[in-house]
Amino acid sequence: MNDKEFGQRVRQLRENASLTREQFCDDELEISVRQLTRIEAGTSKPTFSKIQYIATRLGMGLYELMPDYVSLPERYSKLKFDVLRTPTYENEELMEKRADLMTEIYDDYYADLPEEEKIAIDAIQSTIDVFETKTAEFGQDILDDYFEQIHRKKQFSVNDLLIIQLYLINLRMEVKQSSDFQYFLELVEKFPSQVELVESGDLFILRDVMITSVGLLGQKEEFSYIPTLFEALDKIMQKTQDFQKKPILNLLKWKYELYANNDSEEARRFYEEAVMFAKLIGNAHLIDKLEEDWQIDMKTAEYSGGV
């Protein structure tokens, strides 16, 4: 069954059930009217989660609706995982390696991906582009299409988190509208509860979103939101026993102690722990970045009378 045939089948079954697209999509948190329209027209390849939702709304089993569903290619899934799991810390060699992985995804897999996977890849690439160019000029079409829907959700999917990360990176570069930062604060209040809702294998994506959020909160001096995020980040690391980003978490903690609590002794403790973890994972480039950042913070704090 190709995309056009599947779309026709969904439309016929929906109409047989006497449901309008608006009724079918309900609150549009799982699928929007626009997304359903594209699926029914055969111009959008639905993902597994969308097919599951459609089947549930139609009151039938997944394979009753689409018996020839094929899962994502194993190589593609590995490439995507490696891109998301490998931090570069502005290391040019690692940035080039990540670019090569993304090129392979676009060249070998992108054209045949379901729409939701295409959105995920485009969100990842746009986030990389914003970060590397330091300009909020990428991924705006994704945010325009999906962010409002995501903002209203109580539970976030992996795709939602990737789009939120894109939103945060853009926001870090430029606050375009006064409502943008308020939306961000509303999202921040939802993040801690997601620790129990997100699949354990995907918690590292939530972790990265919260790390970006802490950095943005510190940048805007909204310190009161930060301790709750620290607790959630510590919980994720203990739950997953994944301490890959522990040096970065400690970097954020030392900055919080310096700039929010004016406590240079506690800040130094977190700095030393950050360097220790960076040494444990054998990342010399990260150690240099941590030491450089610490020296800058010490001079800044001293200048402002905080040391």
Language-model features, listed with the residues they occupy:
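DNA major-groove recognition helix of helix-turn-helix/homeodomain DNA-binding modules
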Residues: 49-64
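A short, Lys/Arg-rich alpha-helix, primarily the initiator
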Residues: 1-17
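"A position-specific structural signal for the A-helix of alpha-solenoid helical repeats
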Residues: 81-84, 117-128, 166-169, 208-216, ...
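Alpha-helical adaptor scaffolds
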Residues: 164-260
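Helix-turn-helix/homeodomain-like alpha-helical modules used for DNA recognition
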Residues: 74-132
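Helix-turn-helix repeat elements of alpha-solenoid scaffolds
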Residues: 88-105, 132-148, 177-191, 220-232, ...
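Short alpha-helical DNA-recognition segment
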Residues: 17-38
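Flexible helix-coil transition and linker loops at the boundaries of alpha-helical arrays
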Residues: 104-117, 132, 146-161, 191-203, ...
